[in-house]
Every structure is written in structure tokens, then in C-alpha cells.
Amino acid sequence: MSSKEQKTPDEQVLDQKEAAKGQQADAAPETADVADPRDARIAELEAQLSELQQRERDNMLRVRAEADNVRRRAEMDVEKAHKFAVEKFASEMLPVIDNLERALDTADKANESLAAMIEGVELTLKSLLDAVRKFGIEVVGDVNVPFNPEVHQAMTMLPSADHQPNHVMMVMQKGYTLNGRLLRPAMVAVSKAQD
């Protein structure tokens, strides 16, 4: 070997380092083109995480909406319970009111000896009607109003020149509502056009 070909150990190490750098430089473009499988896995997991977070937000919104609906329904149920708690009692009081009105209709008002009793029945009826009005009970018993099937029950239709067609011309039995809800329809005679 010639002296030029022989290298010192330091030179050999330098040559090896340069060769290694060259190989790394050559290999670097190849590895840059090849995707690291860990990066793909990370991207996949991030996508799953994002999807799960969105589902969780949607579920939370649904749960909150359902809770609000349950709360509102409960409040409405309590309100209805308070508003219509007296419905059964009111229904039982209607025949009492009817009987007092019938007693006044059939009483002999010309008889002076019955005047005090008639006045007592009138005051009792007035007091009872005032008491039930305080709880939202209203009388349905007007005449000369248009027939309303929601609060009237037509018992008969009669021809009449004095009333417009389809108007209440006579109330046979008064009806009642409780806070706008029908307790009992008014039984009425309805006018129809004369032939």
C-alpha cells in the first residue's frame, strides 16, 4: 500500500462519519415520503375524540331540554291541579243551585206569609253563587246569543220571528264553566228561520 492510501485512524473515523452523513442525507428524502404510522393513528384518534365530544354535547343538550320539558310539565300539572281541584265539588253543587232556583220559580210570591222565606232562599242562592264565582265558576245561560256547541246543548229548534236563526231563544237549564272548562252545558232551545 502506498502512503497515500493508508490513512490514520482519525482520518478513517472522519471518512466513516462523512459516509454516514451522506447515507443519512440519501435516506432522509425516502423517509420523508413515507408517513409515520403513529401520525396516522394520532389523526384517527383525534377524529374519534372530536366525534365523541360532539355526541356528548348533543346528549347534554337533549338531557337539558328533556329536564326543562319535565319541569314545565310538572309546573303545568300543579297549576291545573290548583285551578281545577274544586271541579268535582263544583259539579256536586250544581244541582243545589238548580233546586234553589226552581224553589224560587215555583214559590207563591203573592203570599205575604211566604215573603220572608222567599227572601231567605234568594239570599242563600245569591250567597252560594257569589261563593262559587270566587273559585272560577261562571254561569252559561244568556238568551239572544249565537248558539255555541262548546257550551250549549240544543234540546230543540223552534221557528221564531223574534230571534235571529241559530240563536239561543230559551234556556231550559243553565250551564256552568270552571275557569273556562265546561262543567255542564246549558240546555237550550235554538231558533231557526221561519218557513
Curated annotation (Swiss-Prot):
Region (Disordered) location: 1-40
Query: Which keywords does the record carry?
Result: Chaperone, Cytoplasm, Stress response
Q: Where in the cell is it found?
A: Cytoplasm
**Which GO CC terms are listed, alphabetically?**
cytosol
Using the UniProt record, give the first listed, main subcellular location: cytoplasm
- Its Gene Ontology biological processes? protein folding
Q: Which domain of life is it from?
A: Bacteria
Where is this chain compositionally biased, Basic and acidic residues type? 1-20
One Pfam family assigned to this protein is GrpE
Q: Listed GO molecular functions? A: adenyl-nucleotide exchange factor activity; protein homodimerization activity; protein-folding chaperone binding; unfolded protein binding
The answer on whether this UniProt entry bears the keyword Cytoplasm reads yes
Give yes or no: UniProt keyword Cytoplasm.
Answer: yes
Q: What family does this belong to?
A: Belongs to the GrpE family.
> What does the protein in this record do?
Participates actively in the response to hyperosmotic and heat shock by preventing the aggregation of stress-denatured proteins, in association with DnaK and GrpE. It is the nucleotide exchange factor for DnaK and may function as a thermosensor. Unfolded proteins bind initially to DnaJ; upon interaction with the DnaJ-bound protein, DnaK hydrolyzes its bound ATP, resulting in the formation of a stable complex. GrpE releases ADP from DnaK; ATP binding to DnaK triggers the release of the substrate protein, thus completing the reaction cycle.
Q: Which HAMAP family match?
A: GrpE
Quaternary structure, per UniProt, is:
Homodimer.
Protein name as catalogued = Protein GrpE
* Organism taxonomic ancestry: Bacteria, Pseudomonadati, Pseudomonadota, Gammaproteobacteria, Enterobacterales
Gene coding for it: grpE
